[in-house]
């Protein structure tokens, strides 16, 4: 099909492929004919190896059906892979319509996982249309060992993320992962072709290693502001630190190395699947931002903890709002 059906993301949606045996129609309701992530396919499968009088119950546990399913799945994926190489524009149109469903196979199908991952396409900060992971690696900066990505509810929301600022400033490409299924397959696949996946909203990054610490005159003031923020915000944040991610924005939130990624936690919370209380985040401040500089100058004065109490909460609220969360 060339267009996305209305019920494509309905979990109850069934494949529309018809099964024939020796050119005799058997059923158009055979769930075991194709995996769920190929539910957008249309077509006909004709087998010479099944009996004409086979029942629906027998189809469900028939080893011949398993062989047919594997063969048809392999054939479809191979044809799509050929299309990706020969007709880039046509494949990208296909991916825009059905890619979010096909990526379910990365999570569900161990046998074809690597193949589907190579077929996957994503937007990136390069803003040159869809790109594959192999193409991303070919463009990586010298010495870069990480596949950087950011997740979000939409492409527009991901592009607004302040955590991207430092990566853009250093010309480090970041992939946009904006389908909910991306969060789940990322939990199972830590790397691709020897390059690890790293969220720009979680933990440390190569930016921290490459950015030389500025010996600025207000460094003691920044340290004082960090101490004030930690005191005023308490357990509402896991830590407060200066940021190498930010070049313009005053603040941002990131997940600690061992904590769940921010967007993944939001998805689980929306579906009431989050066990326990949401993790406190790390608040990062931009030492070069004019507002932060002004607050840092106030932080060294007597009584600054009380004087900056409301401002501390405002900074945290601002960081939450930029993440799309209500403070």
Placement of each model-derived feature along the sequence:
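Conserved GHKL (Bergerat-fold) ATPase module
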Residues: 1-327
């Amino acid at each position: 099909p060339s267009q996305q059906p209305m019920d494509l993301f309905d979990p109850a949606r069934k494949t529309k492929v018809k099964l024939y045996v020796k050119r005799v129609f058997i059923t158009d309701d055979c769930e075991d004919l194709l995996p769920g992530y190929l539910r957008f396919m249309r077509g006909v499968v004709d087998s010479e190896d099944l009996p004409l009088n086979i029942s629906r119950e027998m189809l469900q546990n028939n080893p011949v059906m398993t062989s047919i399913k594997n063969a048809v799945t392999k054939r479809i994926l191979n044809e799509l892979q050929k299309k990706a190489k020969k007709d880039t524009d046509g494949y990208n149109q296909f991916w825009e319509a059905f890619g979010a469903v096909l990526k379910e196979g990365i999570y569900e199908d161990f046998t074809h996982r690597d193949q589907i991952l190579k077929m996957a396409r994503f937007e990136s900060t390069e803003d040159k249309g869809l790109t594959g992971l192999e193409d991303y690696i070919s463009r990586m900066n010298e010495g870069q060992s990480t596949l950087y990505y950011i997740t979000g509810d939409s492409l527009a929301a991901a592009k607004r993320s302040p955590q991207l600022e430092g990566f853009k400033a250093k010309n480090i490409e970041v992939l946009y992962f904006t389908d909910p299924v991306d969060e789940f397959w990322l939990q199972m696949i830590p790397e691709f072709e020897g390059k690890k996946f790293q969220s720009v909203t979680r933990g440390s990054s190569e930016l921290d290693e490459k950015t030389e610490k500025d010996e600025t005159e207000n460094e003691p003031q920044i340290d004082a502001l960090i101490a004030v923020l930690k005191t005023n915000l308490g357990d509402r944040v896991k830590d407060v630190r200066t940021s190498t991610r930010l070049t313009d924005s005053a603040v941002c939130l990131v997940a600690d190395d061992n904590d769940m990624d921010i967007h993944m936690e939001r998805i689980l919370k929306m579906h009431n699947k989050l066990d326990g209380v949401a993790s406190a985040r790390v608040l990062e401040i931009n030492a070069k931002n004019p507002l932060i500089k002004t607050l840092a100058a106030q932080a060294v004065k007597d009584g600054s903890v009380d004087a900056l109490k409301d401002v501390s909460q405002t900074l945290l609220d601002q960081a939450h709002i930029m993440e799309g969360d209500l403070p």
